[in-house]
Amino acid sequence: MNFKPFDKKIWLATAMKHGEEIKYIQEAFDTNWITTEGTNLVAIEQQMSEQIGCKYAVALSCGTAALHLAVKLAGVKEGDTVFCTDMTFDATVNAVMYERAVPVFIDTEYDSWNMDPVALEKAFELYPNTKVIMVV
């Protein structure tokens, strides 16, 4: 086979910019808050908690960290069964594996790519004590 490279790069996702990002990035550098702390981070956590109507919100470094925290907060422990869609990024399963739980993959629907409810129902027959369903 003879493959021709693409003429232009195909981006998985592009950065969404709304105008003031450089200002906040520069402020983080200038104040030496290039960590998991700082006034900008505290402000966004406060704004998020107000927006969704909860007492607290926490900003995390990535989706994997968010999924891991969700699994921990759901009380998943070693040996627990967790249903995961078979059409997902590895972060979903990594969050389960970090807790030494057992991921069980559920087929997806062809048209929607969502977890197939018929397959999910059958999985509950096989694993009735499942702790969590990871719907991503």
Pin down the residues of each PLM region:
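N-terminal "arm"/small-domain region of PLP-dependent enzymes with the aminotransferase-like
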Residues: 1-34
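Alpha-helical elements of Rossmann-like donor-binding domains used by nucleotide-donor carbohydrate transfer enzymes
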Residues: 24, 43, 47, 69, ...
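Phosphate-binding glycine-rich loop
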Residues: 37-81, 95-99, 105-107
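A short beta-strand submotif of the Rossmann-like class I SAM-dependent methyltransferase core
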Residues: 59, 84, 132-136
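Active-site loop/turn elements of alpha/beta-hydrolase fold enzymes
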Residues: 87, 101, 108-110
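Conserved coil-to-alpha-helix start sites within the AMP-binding
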Residues: 88-93
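Active-site phosphate-binding strand-loop segment of PLP-dependent enzymes
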Residues: 111-136
